[in-house]
């Protein structure tokens, strides 16, 4: 059983502190006497989620109740991920009202129990305002709140955990256990291994220690086992090692060596995709690795001097290394396989509010939560687009007052949750209640910047991002000080009062010196300045309720649940995305932020329409009619011909970091052509700019990329040189075999089939060889014009010629099934009820008519009869009953019946990459294939969200938020 601890809130009263009557809660969105649910229109939706790989239904719940303004994607994700109770039982939640009520009523009850509110009326306003904000997708708690709060199971509310490990076998085994329990609950954990003795140090018995890298192997295997044992997502974990640890070089090289193994196994034919069957044979694949560097090391890199590696037990230097060479080795490893990331230790601890209680040694897997060991953090994120006011004529402003009120509401709720929360270990429970770390943040920053006409990599964009961050964190600490006056400061505050208030002054000083740019950011800065003055005054008077207030998390699943265009602080992925439609199907749409930006930039309606049409057709703004070249940068995205530079991402992180208590979950994407020197530059400049942590990701650096065109890296010049004998030995006689076309006879059997796909009618004639399968296909569309008719004729000829030259039909089926474009939808074929396009329907029909059962079954294509048989018996294949035995005949001797061997089914042909998400759409348009795993739930390509991956289709995430 999972060990849990729970109890009354600690720090609710501090000796000598006079308690007030409680918080007065103001109405911001709600109306007295009217419940927020009564102000929206509700409708029933059917949620049916399928796996794009094989068409199987992953999840189905019909008749769920949601507001009419909720997107299909948000409804699907919230229903499948957050509704509690078994589907089909009376205990199953059936609507958003039940879900929100389960949470907000629990928060209200706990708030009243722990004396947060001045009166029952204030408690009611709190409940209504919280319900309104969740209902209208203004903010979202992290996933554990949606999973657990208000249910009979343990009330775990935290997504992020930091563990610790000491140099003893007992502690190391406890690490394995505690980490496993956290993974079992669907959360993530990180820790620093630097207390463990290196392999270069002696044990008390006289032998050499194993070293942390050795113990990482066991923890990695444990995480992989839990993942494969039925967890809802991959285990999320982080391992960190200090740069002065004697085993640092081995730590840096762990994933590089494993990546080389993966390449060798992949080239030998093994399935080494990130979700493949054979990936478990390699090590260290379940964790993010980071090196913790200090200022001493970075200055040694800058000067080119030596750096000392220190023994763990004595602290003495046992080895001197070239700092610049070690730094380059880190960059080379990150260039080769995206690990390790880097964390800047002195920068992190310079902003530490509780140094008297211990250093900050570790982080959560996504690197945004950084605080004391054996603590946790519960997250919440605000949807920034909800605070942008736009009159439709290009006049915009950021609603500063409403933003601050929502921040106060959310911080209050987050702090209340610590009072009733459960935790996976006793140590984590005690420390979290003693320090009450919170992690408020935001999503949709990239969309906000584009909508306001600001390039992501611009001074104006960075000014808005910094101003919002400053106001958010300042308001959070102000509310924390107000809470301290009501229910007391956190237990560790008395010991850390001086450093905590010093960090508050650092935030305020950074706010005062920030550069103001335009009419959008200036009012936000002004409000932030006033807020930080309140923080300093109230903090000195009351103390603070929370040791930490803000982080910027990836906001993967919750970002999609809020229908955000962008996650965390990320820029937009692309200008064109998929939108799911009510009733099924989807369509490609240009981001709604594009017309907003164009209006802000002064374009007229006719110009905007022409530019949007150009983007819809080409996927970018290059050569868009009437668009000024100086405005191109406003529409730069994470991917594409005009993608944001790597340093553009770093500059944005540096612009935000001074006003975030924790850190920022961010991966800096780099093109495949990036060099090791560029990685070094990013790591070095980020340190100088004051960033706390980052990771880089170079396109195509990992083997686990579906349909990667790369099969091996270029050999280094020294290795590439071959002697004359080697070249001579490699020369072999090559015999070239050319395919021969086998034409059909004059008279050939054929089948003509009519079909309807999404209302479009057509006819298919399939002619075959008398004895050898399909050899010709003709297609004709009804009432579709000469252009489409000509294209279908050309397509038919190309397929027919290929078949006659020997291209197997199953190859065409694997390539063209699941291809998605309009017209798509319902068909009149009982065996193919839904088609994603005309060619999807055609080749599914051809597979059913001409391919043997084993071949098409391997491709996931079955008839209606076979699907029904699978539901009834668990098998698609027809069971042939044996004839009744002749009992009398058994008395006679007879030859043993020979049972023919069943031929092995052909190897499954991988389905081609098709655009089922916005990430895949941009890949198809640009010919780029991003390194991202396929979603383990629905089979679509995932996309990056901070340092994690998120599935746009079903909301699954590889991270801990």
UniProtKB/Swiss-Prot annotation:
Q: Where is the active site?
A: 364 (proton acceptor), 366 (cysteine radical intermediate), 368 (proton acceptor)
Give the source's domain of life in one word. Bacteria
Q: Where is this region: Disordered?
A: 1-23
Q: Which EC class, in a word?
A: oxidoreductase
Q: Which reaction does it catalyse?
A: a 2'-deoxyribonucleoside 5'-diphosphate + [thioredoxin]-disulfide + H2O = a ribonucleoside 5'-diphosphate + [thioredoxin]-dithiol
Give the SUPFAM superfamilies listed for this entry.
Answer: PFL-like glycyl radical enzymes
**Pfam families, sorted:** Ribonuc_red_2_N (PF08471), Ribonuc_red_lgC (PF02867), TSCPD (PF12637)
Task: Quote the EC number.
Answer: 1.17.4.1
Q: Which GO terms describe its molecular function?
A: cobalamin binding; cobalt ion binding; nucleotide binding; ribonucleoside-diphosphate reductase activity, thioredoxin disulfide as acceptor
Instruction: Tell me the organism's taxonomic lineage.
Output: Bacteria, Bacillati, Actinomycetota, Actinomycetes, Kitasatosporales
Q: What does this protein do?
A: Catalyzes the reduction of ribonucleotides to deoxyribonucleotides. May function to provide a pool of deoxyribonucleotide precursors for DNA repair during oxygen limitation and/or for immediate growth after restoration of oxygen.
List residues binding substrate.
143, 159-160, 188, 364-368, 554-558
Outline the subunit composition: Homotetramer.
Q: What is this protein called?
A: Vitamin B12-dependent ribonucleotide reductase
The coenzyme or cofactor needed here is: adenosylcob(III)alamin
Covalent S-S links between cysteines: 160-377
Q: Which UniProt keywords apply?
A: Cobalamin, Cobalt, Disulfide bond, DNA synthesis, Nucleotide-binding, Oxidoreductase
Q: How is the cofactor bound?
A: 5'-deoxyadenosylcobalamine (coenzyme B12).
Regarding protein family, the annotation reads: Belongs to the ribonucleoside diphosphate reductase class-2 family.
Q: Per the record's keyword annotation, is Transport included, yes or no?
A: no
